[in-house]
Regions:
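Gram-negative outer-membrane beta-barrel domains
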Residues: 2-252
Length: 252
């Protein structure tokens, strides 16, 4: 009798132990795996405005169709500064960023050389450069690289200057020149809403012929401002409206 009781008691303990082990195994398999919290990436979409400034350089030349003479090529250089407005659209779930941008820059890019008449110096000066471009970029969270291209316009004049005095003997007056621009840059969103950029732009402007007059308005001759190239490197600061975290998640 005692043997039967002992056997039943041992059997009961074994059953309880097996049940506990099975329950523990179930708990172990059903415990949720730990997942790191999602990291939200920067969203570049939205309207932005900014300021920019830098320096430009290039080569220019002039042609005088009346006497059929021309200057040699001469260097031009100077500062640029202005503003920018644009809009970015980052494709959902992607790092690609597309945009439109307008730049409105004041400039002081100028240079001189000896005229065909060596009594005078000939030169040109750009005082404005404006552009309307499309942009395409690729973003790594807060950092974006981009390329741009589109229409460019400059306000320029040719001058004939009296050496030693700086007096303008005759000039074409300010005239607009059409062209195009290609550029590339790097932009960094250092805090929400604010980004800094560095950018290189190449400009090509078409040639244009204008009448050169004395300060009193008396016609002297025609001057052709030949087609020209300008290079500009600038830095800028942009403010982005309605910045918000992107639904794009960081990958582990």
């Amino acid at each position: 009798m005692r043997g039967s009781v002992r056997l039943s008691f041992v059997t009961l303990l074994a059953g309880i132990g097996l049940a506990g082990a099975a329950s523990a195994a179930d708990l172990a398999t059903k415990a949720p795996a730990y997942r790191a919290p999602p990291v939200m990436l920067t969203n570049w979409s939205g309207l932005f405005i900014g300021v920019e400034g830098g320096g430009g350089w290039g080569r220019d030349s002039l042609f005088f169709p009346g006497p059929l003479t021309a200057t040699g090529g001469f260097d031009t250089s100077g500062a640029v500064a202005g503003g920018v407005i644009g809009y970015n659209w980052q494709t959902p779930g992607s790092s690609w960023v597309f945009g439109l941008e307008g730049n409105f820059d004041w400039a002081d890019i100028k240079g001189t050389t000896i005229c065909p008449n060596p009594t005078f110096n000939c030169g040109t000066k750009i005082d404005q450069i404006h552009t309307a471009t499309g942009r395409i970029g690729y973003a790594w969270d807060k950092v974006m690289v981009y390329g741009k291209g589109g229409y460019a316009w400059s306000n320029e004049r040719a001058e004939v200057v009296v050496p030693g005095t700086g007096a303008i003997n005759d000039a074409t007056g300010w005239t607009g020149r059409d062209g195009y621009t290609l550029g590339a840059g790097l932009e960094y969103m250092f805090v929400p809403n604010w980004s800094a950029k560095i950018e290189y732009d190449y400009y090509h402007f078409d040639g244009k012929t204008r009448a050169a007059n004395t300060p009193a308005g008396v016609f002297i001759e025609n001057i052709t401002m030949n087609s020209r190239d300008v290079n500009v490197v600038k830095a800028g600061l942009n403010y982005h409206f309605n910045w918000s975290p992107s639904p794009v998640l960081a990958k582990y």
